[in-house]
């Protein structure tokens, strides 16, 4: 028998005496340690954890991070999933029983972007992967073709919004970036070339999400908002605007990534890893997720200086 339940069904039900021969836990790297253990003890014979500890970890309050003596990466990157994977690999050296499997192909994104993510977030850990679509399987244009005006078939674009145009706000928002994104979104999403494409707008900060949503409400007519709120024939969202955390496990044809942070690197290069200066931009987990949601094109919007 197969029983599929939400994770918190059993973690919140102390009275239910239940167990299973095999327990499979999806997105295991995102589960808080104590909650993960609650699910694991339900297994009588086998536990299968599925996840990616190079992507988003379990949630930790940002204020706790700031007050600690540890960097953001040191503090939250180590999940129970990551720890158990290391233990499983170590056990393999003693008994040659394979306990950890790493998938080595991705089929979501353009091979150039797939290689970038593999080289920058996985390769040094011995977990690099290939991108068969457009390389060993068919041609790139068979899978990643898009004809949006100005970025035709271009997988990676940097849309520069300099510090001279506007500075980041104390509440972690940057209006000039939001305006630029909404300008291009309106140009492309209603075009003939973009009518069947899905669009995602990712940022690291809730205030930037609110700013972008407000600009869409102001600059799009009600009819236009109704159009972008409809799902495509396959059930896909036309548009999603959100923080990185709301995009894990999701994919869109075209993704805008709003950086927000804008500081003069020349004056603070010796503090490049300081969490208080760069916040989530020094979190490799969040960068990994934010730069791997697109299928056809990733458009990074920020200050290149």
What are these regions (language model features)?
Residues 2-305:
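Conserved helicase motor core of SF1/SF2 NTP-dependent helicases
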